[in-house]
């Protein structure tokens, strides 16, 4: 499974969840709560246990914009860490720099966050980091580079973020275009429409 680069709205309809986590895509899903294409509204037969687990794995990987190799490697790492594997796995996903940039509201989607990171618009503890998969640590300060703060996209995103609830594991200083990753998110903090146990079962088969 490579990284999906097509329409995020169409892919969200196929997976049945809001992969972009934006109001725009959610409104579209509310209007068309079925798969894309001329056969999207047809009732399908009961899926097999394998296909249910495969689809759950694909949904989570696409939600975070990862290819199969990245996703599998991260899962294997989570499996070797003490604790609840599913929760540890989700925490590792949440610690990706592109995801933290998205959570802080600097970018409107994770896809846009990856672009911002890759183009050098994001700093970690005052230093430029251009690797989307960089793992953010507790206490790290993430900020927008001084020269990038006047960009129209970033200004619009920050204005929109002021109207939304900030993730409880993040402390924001929106006026100064920065935030701190203050703690690991608990499972109940993450409103993800995902059953991570299915993913554990998929990789354990």
Swiss-Prot record:
Signal peptide: none annotated. CDD domains: S4. It comes from the Bacteria. One of the primary rRNA binding proteins, it binds directly to 16S rRNA where it nucleates assembly of the body of the 30S subunit. With S5 and S12 plays an important role in translational accuracy. One of its GO terms (molecular function) is rRNA binding. This is Small ribosomal subunit protein uS4. Residues 95-170 form the S4 RNA-binding domain. It holds the Pfam family Ribosomal_S4. Residues 1-51 are annotated as: Disordered. PROSITE patterns: RIBOSOMAL_S4, S4. The keyword rRNA-binding applies. PANTHER family: 30S 40S RIBOSOMAL PROTEIN (PTHR11831), SMALL RIBOSOMAL SUBUNIT PROTEIN US4M (PTHR11831:SF4). Part of the 30S ribosomal subunit. Contacts protein S5. The interaction surface between S4 and S5 is involved in control of translational fidelity. GO terms for cellular component: small ribosomal subunit. Belongs to the universal ribosomal protein uS4 family. Keywords: Ribonucleoprotein, Ribosomal protein, RNA-binding, rRNA-binding.
């Amino acid at each position: 499974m490579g990284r999906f680069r097509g329409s995020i709205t169409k892919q969200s309809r196929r997976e049945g969840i809001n992969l972009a986590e934006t109001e725009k895509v959610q409104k579209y899903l509310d209007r068309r709560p079925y798969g894309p294409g001329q056969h999207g509204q047809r009732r399908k037969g009961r899926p097999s246990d394998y296909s249910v687990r495969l689809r759950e794995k694909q949904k989570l990987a696409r939600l975070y914009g990862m290819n199969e190799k990245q996703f599998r490697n991260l899962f294997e790492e989570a499996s070797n860490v003490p604790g609840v594997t599913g929760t540890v796995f989700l925490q590792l996903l949440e610690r990706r720099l592109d995801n933290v940039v998205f959570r802080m509201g600097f970018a409107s989607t994770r896809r846009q966050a990856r672009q911002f990171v890759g183009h050098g618009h994001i700093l970690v503890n005052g230093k430029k980091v251009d690797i989307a998969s960089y793992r953010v640590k507790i206490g790290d300060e993430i900020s927008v580079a001084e020269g990038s703060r006047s960009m129209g996209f970033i200004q619009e995103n920050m204005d929109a973020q002021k109207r939304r609830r900030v993730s409880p594991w993040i402390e924001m200083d929106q006026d100064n275009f920065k935030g701190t990753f203050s703690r690991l998110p608990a499972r109940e903090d993450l409103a993800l429409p995902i059953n991570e146990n299915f993913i554990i079962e998929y990789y354990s088969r």
